[in-house]
Amino acid sequence: MRIIMIGPPGSGKGTQTQLLSKYFHIPCISTGEILRKEIKKNKKTKKYIKKTINKGKLIKNSFIIKIIEKNIKKKKFFNGFILDGFPRNIEQAKSLSKKINIEYIIYLKIKYDDIIKRITGRLIHASSGRTYHKIFNPPKIKNKDDITQEKLCSRNDDNEKTIKIRLQEYKKHTNPLIKWIKKKKKIKFIEIHANQSIKIVNKKIIYNINNNNINK
């Protein structure tokens, strides 16, 4: 099974990817985690990625396509995966669809006002990418990761000004992508309203996949 999770920043892609990975027993591929690994490799890459993300912009296609496709080829992903945060535009989707057969695309839809509320309260475990929220999904111990007990932090780009830029980028690139996906008969497109609890969103995703419900 090959599943792709798309949606605006703050829609809960990372959280739902982790939950689906456990339920279906298939590995997940996090675009954010891949970029964090790339940052560690050399200073030039680190500078470019951090500068781009902090501005709320998208990583250039040639760079992100290359590293995502390189990771997908790893042996552990041969029998399926859940990909979070890629593709983000039509060019990326076209490139990916030439390499693999995508079975499901899960689109988490949410109002932009709700996104700003979610992101401004978001907490991150830096080394793993696990996400929490001060109100909607708090850690068991305040400001500490549930698994490692390490301190949580906020992302530099999790401020209202940068969020609005990221949402503008999203509308510009990803809205046309969704229209493109809906035209592809071989891809099963599932749209879920993400302004519900994590548990309800997860149940709806699993129900739609198991019952082969699609929104086209």
Curated annotation (Swiss-Prot):
Keywords: ATP-binding, Cytoplasm, Kinase, Nucleotide biosynthesis, Nucleotide-binding, Transferase. It comes from the Bacteria. Residues 121-158 are annotated as: LID. The keyword Repressor does not apply. GO terms for biological process: AMP salvage. GO terms for cellular component: cytoplasm. One of its GO terms (molecular function) is adenylate kinase activity. Residues 30-59 are annotated as: NMP. ATP binds at residues 10-15, 122, 131-132, 196. NCBIfam families: adk. Monomer. Catalyzes the reversible transfer of the terminal phosphate group between ATP and AMP. Plays an important role in cellular energy homeostasis and in adenine nucleotide metabolism. Belongs to the adenylate kinase family. This is Adenylate kinase. It comes from Buchnera aphidicola subsp. Cinara cedri (strain Cc). The gene is adk.
